[in-house]
Amino acid sequence: MVAAVATAWLLLWAAACAQSEQDFYDFKAVNIRGKLVSLEKYRGSVSLVVNVASECGFTDQNYRALQQLQRDLGPHHFNVLAFPCNQFGQQEPDTNREIENFARRTYSVSFPMFSKIAVTGTGAHPAFKYLTQTSGKEPTWNFWKYLVDPDGKVVGAWDPTVPVAEIKPRITEQVMKLILRKREDL
């Protein structure tokens, strides 16, 4: 009996440890064109994960700033990962194809875009559940930004009122750390 209880506790402890070892890049998501993508492909680079919307008051300033950030820092060491979401004010009502066309045509977006998802509630995408749980900050509107380090750990989270320009130094710092780490590995 004691051995069975000890074994059960050991299994629970192992499961808890395995869950705590999970990181952002362990998840999969469907890209904007409908292909299942392992986020593992972004491991080893810094990611800024953003829930986007095409018809929001924050759309113009954020898409412009995010694309400039991608141009300045990406794609070898950094990527913006955009996840359209229609949960806040129904401001992303279009299809994935229309969302992609809008972003590429209007803002020349070159960063990866994913299919429309839920980012809060019981139907939230598992990657966003992870971002929310590990940062302690759940999106309450469009254009929440989560900074993920090369190992998949969340190292920052900002609400939509914080401009990309204000967090760019923090992102640049993460990218520089990554570049220095890669040089040391040579």
From Swiss-Prot:
Active site (catalytic residues): 56
Subcellular localization, as worded in the UniProt entry: Secreted
Database matches in InterPro entries: Glut_perox_Gpx7, Glutathione_peroxidase, GPX_AS, GPX_CS, Thioredoxin-like_sf
GO molecular function per UniProt: catalase activity; glutathione peroxidase activity
GO biological process, one term: response to oxidative stress
Entry GO terms, CC: endoplasmic reticulum; extracellular region
Coiled-coil intervals: none
Residues of the signal peptide: 1-18
Primary location class: secreted
Top enzyme category: oxidoreductase
PROSITE patterns xref list: GLUTATHIONE_PEROXID_1, GLUTATHIONE_PEROXID_2, GLUTATHIONE_PEROXID_3
Catalytically driven reaction(s): 2 glutathione + H2O2 = glutathione disulfide + 2 H2O
Keyword hit for Chloroplast: no
Swiss-Prot/TrEMBL keywords: Oxidoreductase, Peroxidase, Secreted, Signal
EC number: 1.11.1.9
Pfam family, one: GSHPx
Function: It protects esophageal epithelia from hydrogen peroxide-induced oxidative stress. It suppresses acidic bile acid-induced reactive oxygen species (ROS) and protects against oxidative DNA damage and double-strand breaks.
Family: Belongs to the glutathione peroxidase family.
The protein, known as: Glutathione peroxidase 7
Gene that this polypeptide is encoded by: Gpx7
